[in-house]
Amino acid sequence: MNKVVYTAIFGGYDDVVEPTYRPDGWDFVCFTDTDLVSEFWEIRNVLPLYEDSTRNARRYKVLPHRWFPNHEISCWIDGNAQVRGDINELLDYVQNVDFATFDHNQCYLDPRNCVYEEANVIISAGNRNTQNRPNEVPFDNPYYHYQDNPNLILKQMKRYQSENYPSQNGLLSSMVLLRRHSEEKCQQTMEDWWTEIKYGSKRDQLSFNYSAWKNNFEFNYLEGDVRNNKHFLHMGRHKKKRVRQ
C-alpha cells in the first residue's frame, strides 16, 4: 500500500516544517512555488494558477487523486502543522470509509459545529478588525482584514440554505485530511469540494461538510483537538512573506 504525507506552500508564507517523527511506509511531498530546501521532504516545484496563494494551496490540498495516482492513501497537513507521532495508528479511521479529519467542535479554544456559525465568525472578525484598525485598510482592498470577501461568503451560505442544507450539521477542522483517495466516491466528493472553493469562498471549512452531505459521503472524525494531539501539532500562525537571499 503506497501512502503519502503532503503539504503545499505558496507565496513564501511558510517554511516547510520538519516532522519530529517519521512513520514507516510514508512518502513526504511538499508542493511549492518557492525556493524551499529540506532534507526530509521531497520538494516539488510547481507553477501557481491563481494570484491568490491560499487558493493555489487549496487546489493541492483538496485533490490528492490528481497528484498521487500511484498512492492509495494520502494525509494532507497544512504548511504550519507538524507530524509528531505514528500516523499509521490512524489508518483504522479509513478502514470502512474513505475520509477522516478532525472535528472543529473538539477544538478547545473555539468549538463550533456549523458552517453557518463559521461564516458568521469569519465575517464578524473582519468587521471588528476593520473597525479597530481602519488606517491599515488599503484604498483598493476594502476587505483587507477579512479572511475572504464577506459578500461572497454570504452568497454561498444563502445558496446552501436554499438547498435546505441543515444547520448544526458538523464542521471539520481541516489542518489534517486523511484519505483513501484512490476510491471513486472520495474523488467525486473532493472534486465537488474543489468546485465550491474555486468558485465560492476559499475558506475550505465552509464547504466540506456541505459537499459531503450533497454526495452522501460518509467520513470519520479523528479523536482530539486538531491543534495539539498525539500525532500532529499546530505550529502557530502562518509566517509573513519573506524573501530568500
Put a short name on every predicted segment:
Residues 6, 29-31, 44, 75-77, ...:
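Hydrophobic/aromatic beta-strand patches that form the interior of the parallel beta-sheet core
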